[in-house]
From Swiss-Prot:
Gene Ontology, cellular component aspect: cytosol
HAMAP family in the record: Glu_tRNA_synth_type1
Listed GO biological process terms: glutamyl-tRNA aminoacylation
Principal subcellular localization: cytoplasm
Enzyme class per UniProt: ligase
Organism name: Dinoroseobacter shibae (strain DSM 16493 / NCIMB 14021 / DFL 12)
SUPFAM superfamilies: An anticodon-binding domain of class I aminoacyl-tRNA synthetases, Nucleotidylyl transferase
Pfam families linked: Anticodon_2, tRNA-synt_1c
Annotated protein name in UniProt: Glutamate--tRNA ligase 1
Functional summary from the UniProt entry: Catalyzes the attachment of glutamate to tRNA(Glu) in a two-step reaction: glutamate is first activated by ATP to form Glu-AMP and then transferred to the acceptor end of tRNA(Glu).
Gene: gltX1
Reaction equation(s) it catalyzes: tRNA(Glu) + L-glutamate + ATP = L-glutamyl-tRNA(Glu) + AMP + diphosphate
EC number: 6.1.1.17
Motif ('HIGH' region): 15-25
InterPro entries: aa-tRNA-synth_I_cd-bd (IPR045462), aa-tRNA-synth_I_codon-bd_sub2 (IPR020751), aa-tRNA-synth_I_CS (IPR001412), aa_tRNA-synth_I_cd-bd_sf (IPR008925), Glu-tRNA-ligase_bac/mito (IPR004527), Glu/Gln-tRNA-synth (IPR000924), Glu/Gln-tRNA-synth_Ib_cat-dom (IPR020058), GluQ/Sye (IPR049940)
Length: 471
């Protein structure tokens, strides 16, 4: 059995808390979130923390923080897989009592010896337990594991929504362990029990789990449970087509936040990594949720392309509401450990936004362009800007100050006054703009000098010119 079209969609993201939220895991979470949200379903979060030696509370919090930054809200409380160990063991015992699983007393040393001999003789190393059909009366008083009785004939077909039908001969499946000799459940059992108990209808995960699906299907069949829809998505590779690694750049979601990408841009970019909707590249959440379907996921690995991410990031900054940009900038500063913007700086940034966001790719670009409004007097020019404030330039700026004193503070008037002064000295406007930028912003790359003057206002502009000419 499998979920019907009428079943409410329930997806899940189930990371192991052994490190940061990987960019590949973030995309898996996004695909699950989009699929559920676009169908009015639920997106659940399960922390697969059964490996106590490697699982940490810090990693769990990093996963939560990464998902929150990405804006991937989950329904209900996050589930701890480790807390369900008793339930997982209960299912294994039920299968044993139903004759669909059995106690195996073969030791690890015996299995190792079998496999070594099989390799030496060129035989299959697939272990077949002699205890599969043994009379319980013959069971020794010794440690045992519980194994499922795998089908030995026929074929298991994984009807995968991305990979297509994947066929695995059942004689290649082993009687996998469900309960270890210490009574603890194995990961493969825990995943299936949790997915069933959580009502998961669609398992969307990386294709590195594809081989697990056939073995997990055995448990669904043995328990008579509805089979979820499987969709195994290709992994993300680096620009060179090789498996993504540190040499390709950032791997953790928190690194992308610290680089200054807006979360909206990351969602857009990650959605396009392996999924497409025609030629659409730039879109928001509402469109992505409406468009996203499993049919649009390709089989080939997607390649990370930071230039494309930069372009999308710039497009999103260009259309974001000013207050959203200010909030995003504060988040970026927090992620890098920098001091937050003051209330006055937030106000100034909002006032200057119209001349900042069009050409910025990321938050650090925008904040650098906003230096003129975020900095306070006296402005300290950087080395490149300082070169334009020579004696001649300071003299011309000193002439400009009284001309601006009573000028109406409009773009046309300011352009006329500055342009007239440049012409009087036989200069092009650009020659006068350079020392003006240095005086007003302390930088050589800034928004238009007239935009800066309008944003700063008359008093602040004149004060900065006075500082520059009297230095």
């Amino acid at each position: 059995m499998s979920p019907t079209d009428a079943s409410p969609v329930v997806t899940r993201f189930a990371p192991s808390p052994t490190g940061y939220l990987h960019i590949g895991g973030a995309r898996t979470a996004l695909f699950n979130w989009l699929y559920a949200r676009g169908r009015g379903g639920k997106f659940l979060l399960r922390i697969e923390d059964t490996d106590k030696a490697r699982s940490t509370a810090e990693a769990t919090e990093a996963i939560f923080a990464g998902l929150r930054w990405l804006g991937l809200d989950w329904d209900g409380d996050a589930v701890s897989q480790a807390e369900g160990a008793a339930r997982h063991a209960q299912v294994a015992r039920a299968l044993q009592e139903a004759g669909k699983a059995y106690k195996c007393f073969t030791t690890q040393d015996e299995i190792a010896a079998f496999r070594e001999a099989a390799r030496a003789e060129g035989r299959s190393t697939l272990f077949r337990s002699p205890w599969r059909d043994a009379d319980p009366a013959s069971h020794p008083d010794a440690p045992y594991v519980i194994r499922i009785k795998a089908p030995q004939e026929g074929t298991t077909v994984i009807a995968d929504q991305v990979q297509g039908d994947v066929r695995i001969r059942n004689d290649q499946l082993d009687d996998m362990i469900l309960l270890r000799s210490d009574g603890s459940p194995v990961y493969m059992l825990a995943v299936v029990v949790d997915d069933h108990d959580m009502g998961v209808t669609h398992v969307i995960r990386g294709d590195d789990h594809l081989n697990n699906a056939a073995r997990q299907m055995m448990i669904y069949d043995a328990m008579g449970w509805d089979m979820p829809v499987f969709a195994h998505i290709p992994l993300i590779h680096g620009p060179d087509g090789k498996k993504l690694s540190k040499r390709h750049g950032a791997l953790g979601v928190e690194e992308y936040q610290a680089m200054g990408y807006p979360a909206q841009a990351m969602r857009n970019y990650l959605a396009r990594l392996g999924w497409s909707h025609g030629d659409d590249e730039f879109f928001g959440d509402a469109q992505a949720q409406a468009w996203f379907d499993l049919d649009g996921i390709g089989k080939s690995p997607a390649r990370l392309d930071l230039k494309k991410l930069d372009n999308l990031s710039g497009q999103h900054l260009g259309v974001m509401a000013d207050e959203a940009i200010v909030a995003g900038a504060q988040g970026y500063l927090a992620a890098t450990g920098a001091p937050p913007l003051t209330e006055a700086q937030e106000t100034g940034l909002s006032r200057a936004m119209y001349c900042l966001k069009d050409r910025a790719k990321k938050f650090p670009d925008l904040l650098e362009k906003a230096h003129f409004i975020l900095a306070s007097r006296p402005i300290d020019p950087d080395p490149k800007a300082a070169k334009s404030l020579d004696t001649v330039s300071r003299g011309i700026l000193a002439e400009l100050t009284p001309q601006l004193q009573n000028a109406s503070w409009t773009r046309d008037t300011l352009e006329g006054v500055v342009g007239g002064l440049a012409e009087a000295h036989g200069l092009g406007l650009g020659k006068l703009a350079a020392p003006l930028r240095a005086a007003l912003a302390g930088r050589s790359a800034t928004p238009s000098v007239f935009d800066m003057m309008l944003v700063l206002g008359r008093d602040e502009t004149l004060a900065r010119l006075s500082d520059a000419t009297s230095a």
